[in-house]
């Protein structure tokens, strides 16, 4: 009789599945028949297997057994078989189904894992798995649809629902209880790069965030080696601060290489000093036993042992004496496991798989019992599993009062694991086991985070306690009110201190200001003098005087900047009154581009009497503008002012006055002399508020002259008191007069041909109205109309400064009146000439450069010259074989004695010019000339193989032929004879010296060539054997005669030759003179010297008529 296979949806009815006489109870009675007799044994052998009489419940165990060797070490086949064998032998399950197990492989890649789940659910009645968290939620839905009980032991955040019943408490719940107990809210996750661990990290971070914890970072180790670990830890170190790092990967205690690399990298980066706690994730799925056996991976690595001191291990709890290894040992002793199985190589995950299968079976049994043995659904099985209490591999599964997790830590030596705390995720409690946690280096636990992160009823804003926020808010209010009071007090106090001391003080003395005055000349007084430009004085006319100020100057230096001093009337000022200080402080705060900056009040003694109490000079110190006043600028006729230039100046003036009027300051003394221009041609208003300062200081102003009142409004002329204070409308009138000055470039009212006194009288007492006359061609019509509005008789008819600003801007149709643009337009007419001039100068420079290059290449080889021009060093160069030429004029000493110095220079210049023309047609390099000696080389600086000997030989023949017809200009009857010496060999060439560098040759070849010349004869080419060999090898028809044995100084006796010609050489060669026996080859005979020259020679060298 065959067994019935239960469908995936549950069990059929008892009557259909298990007949009464075939139940497990009857089978048990049959198996318990007494007597060991042979009939009984035969009957036992003939009985069918129990599964033949029971319904079969197939359990699928899904996991990455084929693609992950560490998961494979859990031996899921043996674990599931051991569980089903014990279930099938359990008499307490009498009448229940027969359990069979199927091991199902789960791919390590997420897409394959989903496919494996879908396939498994069609083949089994209950499924243990999957392990990949990405497949957990789809597995729950598919299992619910298929009615299959699901035990997903690898999903960190899965809750019991529907047909799903986790074998143990979800990892996220256990972790949350631990983090809450220590108040570690800020965590980071590092995952292995495999899909399974990446998805586990995502699922765990989602579960922790759902519980309100701020997961700062989830990162992977890519690559999965030491470098990837360092990079992942650097991201955590450089990111938001965290307390805990959860390592989502195989534990190093089970051989996980990624976690080994991670801990070693943390030790290298100094992150295992107690500032971070490292929590392994995979130990939450199995029971890791305390003791020294668990740390076998650290035996040969002290570095890893030190790093693991920062690790806290949260794992499932086994009762004392009931660890996974103890249970494996007992099962092997009872022959339930193969005897050859190495238990040390079995992963603790063995017990987790065993428990999942066992728990599933307990749920099936309770579900069938609840319905009387009939059909049950997957949801019923899952519900019974959640309420079941069965004996697992190392303890009781299901509802129990004992804590299900323990917290393990290493001792100080890192030699064993010990239990520090017991954790109950159901009650959310963590109680001490008697041994405290040992943090690295004896440090305390990482600082706790705010408790609001763990309170679901409180919104935690960045980890700040609400109470602290409220207290902080009150503190801010109190501090704000106190600060406002202190600020008000300190402002007045600092203002007073700034007036008398500090870098921003406004009371200046002789120690602060250095004055300048002309030497021996006169200048205008401080108060009445016009503002002259400092640029008009030469540096030889000014000097620094670190003493009392002279009355003849109003320019000084303050903190390195030029300043201008405006003197108060009088010279006996006792002190600066407080009202003056306050008034000046307000004026000093005025900051605008078109308003001169006030720097301080100067108080010192006079020039004649030292500074004494009650006597001194008081002046306003303001910034100095280099181009002087507007009055001075208009008077300089060499400065051309077009309309754009004028409108730019006027617009600056209007903007400055507009700023002052917005601040409630009436100038009262506005005139072109109180408008200054800086180096950028920006106009600035100065002397503003001067009347206020005089009034505050209680100083009576000096009566103004008629010339100073030309800018004053008529209503102010009629009221002196009002004139001293000034009005806004009066400033508008003064502005109109300044506009007339700028437009006409003349003094006020200049076109009326009246004296200042007459003008003031007519303006003060109309009618008729006395106003300037401006021609229509001097300015736009709008500008003339604006001037007329500004100098209206009635103040209320004059426009405000704001309206004046708008009207003046409309004159230029909105175009910007920038002086720089105006100056650029003025310079455009010179641009073409400037370009032509630059081009001409560039061509001249290029020509001079070419001349310099030609001169340099005449003095040095081109390659050497280029190197020197580029600034690079010229290294000495060795040449294996070159040919050198030396020549000398026979009797040059005698010729020099018979000639004037200028005649000797002409002789050498003519001769060497001839030589230079000849060497230009040969591949040779002229090395140098020393007196009458001429040195040429071939084969350097450019190598030419062995042609150097032929080039020098041909050149020597050409030179000898040319010398035969050469005559001196001052002694044409005296022949010029030369001796020539040739030699070939190696040498070194290089540039010698820094001043007038020369390209020089060094080596024995140079000496030998010189000896060949000195031992030669007139009109002869003396050739060494080394050159002869090369010429013969070239076979170009050179004709040579053997001279015989010749003694060379320093070289001994050698065979030498005369070069007498070459086949095809048709130029005449002079005949060598016949030498008398004993005669020298270095002189000129007496008969060849003209009589008149001979007398000169006899006087110069008495008794000698030949010589060199």
Swiss-Prot record:
GO terms for molecular function: ATP binding; GTP binding; guanylate cyclase activity; identical protein binding; peptide receptor activity; protein homodimerization activity; protein kinase activity; protein-containing complex binding. It comes from the Eukaryota. It is a single-pass type I membrane protein. Expressed in retina and enriched in photoreceptor outer segments. Its EC number is 4.6.1.2. Residues 520-811 form the Protein kinase domain. Catalyzes the synthesis of cyclic GMP (cGMP) in rods and cones of photoreceptors. Plays an essential role in phototransduction, by mediating cGMP replenishment. May also participate in the trafficking of membrane-asociated proteins to the photoreceptor outer segment membrane. This is Retinal guanylyl cyclase 1. It comes from Rattus norvegicus.
